[in-house]
């Protein structure tokens, strides 16, 4: 059928888009706008998966104005249809097809049944189960959290759930080194992408970390990002195309944007939804002279709705630098540094009160006054009385309620997440070994002996410079044939990736990785547990960064730190200062840089000449440092923001979330569904044992391509621990693209839409007709509203006997399906022809019955949406009165969403998705 502008067509692959209208046409493509979903699609005319929608005389037509009427006549004029319709006022009116409502139900299952396109009964069962699983997954609170290839770390899951559920989140992720900020950012992003809150994402990272982010996003989250650099962008300049509009998920380097201002302008014009900046502490800012990098990130942050900044801890940054990050997130709120400092001081009494609540101590009168001042709108006297009561359960409830109220009103608690090792338990120990040598030149011999003694271990070696690392590699290779990889800042990103992969290879890889102290930034090697400091890093932060390559989440063993140096050498004395003064080898030392600056003059003498200080003078320096460290530690502990820590690690709720995902990991439900899906589609399966299988395409599959299935096959596992150990395997969860798109493949395709089966039952007369009808209640609405969380496509099952009685509740689906036998296609077609009028009558009866079942589902969805969105709006409005970090724009968006959501849910409808005709026989 020829295309014409104004015609109405249906997408066969995306029924949920509703009825589309042709808006543009050329020799090769047709453009269709789908008003119900506010989406546009462009199709190749030769292969367009479209169905022309033509209504017949006697059918009911829905007008876009909201009324319905019976079609009296149909006329075709130049390819466009005009319907003569009787409207509700009993008037005959002409309706052009462009005025037909875009929200429309299609009984394609019936059409397939009567046109001899009858599927097997097992295909119908797969379709119904798929619809049920689809509904369950849209409603699941674990959606977007469980699919990450990572361990179930409670604080990471808490942050991902808390931030991921927000509208346009703008937050600072400032966990200590090794606690997984990259994973947190990826989980937040995945959550937002799943909810369709964001679609276009820009990630800006240091040049050395580009490939690592690219690999992490793909390996852990199945997100395919594009890497942008000048060479790639130059290809688009000839066509005058903004390169940033050619991809939705983009990674680029900070240095590249800094040196190419024209690319910043293009990024500003590309309308991204989400900005992620790693190592944001490198953005230098002061009130008088902010850096160029800070300024262009500020420009991007002003126009991109969602912003995630990954940065060092506030203790490491210093207050001014910390303020600069917060200023990027909310310049209206953080407009003046001195005001910010005063506000931070104001929270100290509240922190003290929280300490008392956590320690189950009685609240002092001063603490009660501070709590009352902060919670002005809440009557806290009953809670104070409960805390003073003798009822332990009542006491704990009141303490938790007060703590939660204080967290909600915390100064930066909504914008800042900072977990510390002190707050996150379960890390292995660090064990420091100082190796005293006769001479500095003995280090190479010691290293060779050490490597020979630990042949089966992976060893990470830190050198001061790239030259030292290169020289060491040559010596190890030539003298002992020790396989070593080199890693330093002068290598290209690809060379560093290859070196890291060579070191990570457990079978044929390098035993040792020789890295410059700067070159290792951002790289993680927690599969190794031995660190050799061939040269000592020049400051405490650099030392912590080097140790943090191994000592991080995922490390299973104690980290052994070896420091070989000559007795009384400058390196030896500096190592003693790190160890005895800072205790920086065996514990993290957030005050390290402050002490390094405080004793800079003395340390400079030690580093330049080991005898510049006498032993007594050096011992005095160690004592002074230790005393200053203890004093700073006490001050830090006093200023330790327990409210922020509670908000960041999530406590019992975070653990409960991890436990829920672990329970789902152990459930056989996904495995059973996936294997049945692969089997019916025609995907070949080879069991490898040990919780893994190889799946491969075949020439007899029901579909041309199965999502994510390569021609050579894919090894998959449903086991999280195995997936973490074997990166070459795909980790299948309900969130994996192969499963999600497999569900979409079935739900949006024709598999199982019309089926027929035989029921052997001696109690029923032979030839008794039953019909199973599966309707789907859904809302055809814009994606951004995320109405699937309230009303996902919801299947309603009817089982009608030949008198039109619904037995769906009395006869369970699986019980009935297990008793059915297949029918040959020819016999099935003959039976359908013979029973057509009865089948049509039963379908009409089903259409009448489903209304009473669908309307309560829609009403409940509206009620849920109203309650949930209203509760969040009311909560934010109450908090905004006492916490300036709540943005009015966030409340405005939620109010707009509530109005639009309720309006769209009122338009929700239902359609017949699939049916199964069942004929009985005695045998």
UniProtKB/Swiss-Prot annotation:
Family: Belongs to the SNF2/RAD54 helicase family. RapA subfamily.
PROSITE patterns assigned to the protein according to its UniProt record, in alphabetical order: HELICASE_ATP_BIND_1, HELICASE_CTER
Source organism of the structure: Haemophilus influenzae (strain PittEE)
Presence of keyword Magnesium: no
All copies of domain Helicase ATP-binding, residue ranges: 162-332
CDD domains: DEXDc_RapA, SF2_C_SNF
Entries under PANTHER family matching the protein: DNA ANNEALING HELICASE AND ENDONUCLEASE ZRANB3 FAMILY MEMBER (PTHR45766), SWI_SNF-RELATED MATRIX-ASSOCIATED ACTIN-DEPENDENT REGULATOR OF CHROMATIN SUBFAMILY A-LIKE PROTEIN 1 (PTHR45766:SF6)
Sequence positions that bind ATP: 175-182
Entries under InterPro entries matching the protein: Helicase_ATP-bd (IPR014001), Helicase_C-like (IPR001650), Helicase_RapA (IPR023949), P-loop_NTPase (IPR027417), RapA_C (IPR022737), SNF2-like_sf (IPR038718), SNF2/RAD54-like_C (IPR049730), SNF2_N (IPR000330)
GO biological process, one term: regulation of DNA-templated transcription
Quaternary organization: Interacts with the RNAP. Has a higher affinity for the core RNAP than for the holoenzyme. Its ATPase activity is stimulated by binding to RNAP.
Job of this protein: Transcription regulator that activates transcription by stimulating RNA polymerase (RNAP) recycling in case of stress conditions such as supercoiled DNA or high salt concentrations. Probably acts by releasing the RNAP, when it is trapped or immobilized on tightly supercoiled DNA. Does not activate transcription on linear DNA. Probably not involved in DNA repair.
Name this polypeptide is given: RNA polymerase-associated protein RapA
NCBIfam families listed in its UniProt record: PRK04914.1
Entry annotated with the keyword ATP-binding: yes
EC number: 3.6.4.-
């Amino acid at each position: 059928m020829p295309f014409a502008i104004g015609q109405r067509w249906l997408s066969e692959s995306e029924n949920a888009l509703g009825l589309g209208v042709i808006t543009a046409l050329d020799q090769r493509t047709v453009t269709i706008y789908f008003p119900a979903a506010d989406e546009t699609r462009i199709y190749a005319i030769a292969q367009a998966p479209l169905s022309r929608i033509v209504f017949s005389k006697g059918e009911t037509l829905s007008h876009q104005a909201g009324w319905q009427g019976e079609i009296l006549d149909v006329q075709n004029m130049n390819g466009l249809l005009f319907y003569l319709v009787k409207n509700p006022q009993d008037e005959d009116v002409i309706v052009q097809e462009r005025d037909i409502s875009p929200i429309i139900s299609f009984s394609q299952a019936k059409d397939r049944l009567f046109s001899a396109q009858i599927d097997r009964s097992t295909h119908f069962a797969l379709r119904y189960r798929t619809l049920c699983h689809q509904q369950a997954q849209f409603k699941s609170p674990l959606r977007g959290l469980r699919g990450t290839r990572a361990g179930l770390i409670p604080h990471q899951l808490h942050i991902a759930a808390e931030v991921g559920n927000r509208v346009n989140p703008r937050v600072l992720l400032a966990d200590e080194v090794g606690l997984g900020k990259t994973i947190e950012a990826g989980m937040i992003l995945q959550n937002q992408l799943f909810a369709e809150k964001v679609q276009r994402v820009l990630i800006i990272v240091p040049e050395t970390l580009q490939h690592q982010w690219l690999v992490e996003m793909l390996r852990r989250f199945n997100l395919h990002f594009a890497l942008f650099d000048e060479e790639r962008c130059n290809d688009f300049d000839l066509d005058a195309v903004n390169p940033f509009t050619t991809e939705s998920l983009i990674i680029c380097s900070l240095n590249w944007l800094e040196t190419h201002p024209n690319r910043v302008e293009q990024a500003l014009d590309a309308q991204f939804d989400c900005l992620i900046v790693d190592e944001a502490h490198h953005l230098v800012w002061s009130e008088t002279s902010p850096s160029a990098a800070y300024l262009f990130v500020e420009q991007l942050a002003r126009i991109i709705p969602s912003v995630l900044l990954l940065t060092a801890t506030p203790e490491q940054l210093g207050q001014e630098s910390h303020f600069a990050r917060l200023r990027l997130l909310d310049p209206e709120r953080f407009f003046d540094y001195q005001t910010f400092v005063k506000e931070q001081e104001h929270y100290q009494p509240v922190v003290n009160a929280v300490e008392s609540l956590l320690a189950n101590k009685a609240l002092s009168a001063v603490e009660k006054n501070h709590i009352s001042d902060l919670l002005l709108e809440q009557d806290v006297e009953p809670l104070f009385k409960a805390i003073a009561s003798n009822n332990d359960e009542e006491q704990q409830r009141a303490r938790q309620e007060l703590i939660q109220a204080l967290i909600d009103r915390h100064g930066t608690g909504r914008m800042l997440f900072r977990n510390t090792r002190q707050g996150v338990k379960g890390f292995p120990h660090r064990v420091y070994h100082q190796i005293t040598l006769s001479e500095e030149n003995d280090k190479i011999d010691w290293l060779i002996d050490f490597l020979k003694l630990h042949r089966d271990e992976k060893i990470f070696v830190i050198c001061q410079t790239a030259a030292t690392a290169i020289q060491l590699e040559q010596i190890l290779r030539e003298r002992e044939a020790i396989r070593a990889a080199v890693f330093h800042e002068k290598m290209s990103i690809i060379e560093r990736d290859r070196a890291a992969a060579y070191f990570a290879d457990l079978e044929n890889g390098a035993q040792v990785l020789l890295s410059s102290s700067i070159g290792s930034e951002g790289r993680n090697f927690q599969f190794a547990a031995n660190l050799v400091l061939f040269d000592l890093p020049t400051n405490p932060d650099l030392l912590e960064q080097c140790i943090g390559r191994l000592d991080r989440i995922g490390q299973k063993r104690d980290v052994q730190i070896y420091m070989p140096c000559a007795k009384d050498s400058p390196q030896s004395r500096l190592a003693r200062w790190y160890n005895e003064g800072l205790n920086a080898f065996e514990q993290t030392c957030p005050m390290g840089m402050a002490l390094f600056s405080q004793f800079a003059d003395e340390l400079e003498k030690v580093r330049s000449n080991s005898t510049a200080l006498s032993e007594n003078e050096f011992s005095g320096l160690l004592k002074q440092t230790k005393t200053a460290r203890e004093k700073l530690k006490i001050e830090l502990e006093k200023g330790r923001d327990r409210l922020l820590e509670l908000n960041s690690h999530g406590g019992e709720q975070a653990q409960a979330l991890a436990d829920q995902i672990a329970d789902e990991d152990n459930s056989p439900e996904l495995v059973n569904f996936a294997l049945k899906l692969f089997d019916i589609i025609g995907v070949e399966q080879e069991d490898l044992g040990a919780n893994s299988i190889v799946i491969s395409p075949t020439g007899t599959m029901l579909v041309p391509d199965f999502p994510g299935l390569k021609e050579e096959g894919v090894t998959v596992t449903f086991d999280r621990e195995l997936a973490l150990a074997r990166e070459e395997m795909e980790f299948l969860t309900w969130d994996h693209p192969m499963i999600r798109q497999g569900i979409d493949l079935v739900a949006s395709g024709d598999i199982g839409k019309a089926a027929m089966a035989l029921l052997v039952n001696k109690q029923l007369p032979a030839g008794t007709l039953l019909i199973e009808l599966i309707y789907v209640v859904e809302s055809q609405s814009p994606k951004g509203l995320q109405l699937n969380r309230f009303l996902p496509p919801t299947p309603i099952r009817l089982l009608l006997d030949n008198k039109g009685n619904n037995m769906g509740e009395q006869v369970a689906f699986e019980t009935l399906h297990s008793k059915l036998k297949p029918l040959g296609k020819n016999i099935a077609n003959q039976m359908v022809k013979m029973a057509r009028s009865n089948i049509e009558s039963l379908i009409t009866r089903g259409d009448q019955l489903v209304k009473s079942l669908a309307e309560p589902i829609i009403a409940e969805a509206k009620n849920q949406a109203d309650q949930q969105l209203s509760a969040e709006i009311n909560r934010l409005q109450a908090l905004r009165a006492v916490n300036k970090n709540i943005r009015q724009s966030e409340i405005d968006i939620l109010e707009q969403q509530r109005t639009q959501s309720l309006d769209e849910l009122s338009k929700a409808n239902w359609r017949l998705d699939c049916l199964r005709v069942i004929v009985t026989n005695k045998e």
